[in-house]
UniProtKB/Swiss-Prot annotation:
Any one Gene Ontology cellular component term annotated for this protein: ribosome
Signal peptide location: none
Subunit record text: Part of the 50S ribosomal subunit; part of the 5S rRNA/L5/L18/L25 subcomplex. Contacts the 5S rRNA and the P site tRNA. Forms a bridge to the 30S subunit in the 70S ribosome.
Alphabetical keyword list: Ribonucleoprotein, Ribosomal protein, RNA-binding, rRNA-binding, tRNA-binding
Family under the similarity heading: Belongs to the universal ribosomal protein uL5 family.
Source organism per UniProt: Dehalococcoides mccartyi (strain ATCC BAA-2266 / KCTC 15142 / 195)
Cited function: This is one of the proteins that bind and probably mediate the attachment of the 5S RNA into the large ribosomal subunit, where it forms part of the central protuberance. In the 70S ribosome it contacts protein S13 of the 30S subunit (bridge B1b), connecting the 2 subunits; this bridge is implicated in subunit movement. Contacts the P site tRNA; the 5S rRNA and some of its associated proteins might help stabilize positioning of ribosome-bound tRNAs.
Pfam families the UniProt entry points to: Ribosomal_L5, Ribosomal_L5_C
GO MF annotations, alphabetized: rRNA binding; structural constituent of ribosome; tRNA binding
Keyword Ribonucleoprotein tagged: yes
The protein's name: Large ribosomal subunit protein uL5
Gene name of the encoded protein: rplE
GO biological process, one term: translation
Length: 179
């Protein structure tokens, strides 16, 4: 099975032909992968943030940055500056390792998996994928998680349109649904 980096080198001529790029630098490429999770219960339980951080470190192989509330919301007992989530940005080799794991190990483990949505692209060709439960990742021991936690994976590309981004991710091995 080819890795994502190897698939990209094979995909460049195909993308160049499909979108009629004159210069090889016009071909879209991967920039970064951002993994984000909200830990709303961290407002009342500081241990929740620590366990979520340990899970993100296991999944991404890199320590996350704590995201903080921008403004106070009285109904949620939230004050500006309180920790409410975690995010980690993967670039370079860690990004490719994570995408290999995501495309070929994690997504096939999702129950009743029929492929990822074709419509989760923004207007610039970036793709966002949400997980309701982080236990589908192989590094997470299902017996040790306190609470299933959702997370979001955003794949950022240099594509200009959603069609370019979809073709790039398709050639890299992302399993899209057949609808």
């Amino acid at each position: 099975m080819l890795k994502v980096e190897e698939r990209y080198t094979n995909a460049v001529p195909e993308l160049q032909k499909a979108f009629k790029y004159e210069n090889i630098m016009q071909v879209p490429k991967l920039v970064k992968v951002v993994i984000n999770t909200g830990v709303g219960e961290a407002v009342s339980n500081s241990k929740a943030l620590e366990t979520a951080e340990a899970d993100i470190v296991a999944i991404a192989g890199q320590h996350p940055v704590i995201t903080r509330a921008k403004r106070s919301v009285a109904n949620f007992k939230l004050r500006a500056g309180m920790p409410i989530g975690l995010k980690v940005t993967l670039r370079g080799q860690r990004m490719y390792d994570f995408l290999n794991k995501l495309f070929f190990i994690t997504l096939p483990r999702v129950r009743d998996f029929q492929g990822v949505s074709n419509t989760a692209f923004d207007e610039h060709g970036n793709y966002t994928l949400g997980f309701k439960d982080h236990s589908v990742f192989p590094e997470i021991d299902f017996n040790k998680i306190e609470k299933p936690r959702g997370l979001e994976v955003c794949i950022v590309t240099t594509a200009n349109t959603p069609e370019e981004g979809k073709k790039l991710l398709e050639l890299l091995g992302m399993p899209f649904s057949k609808d």
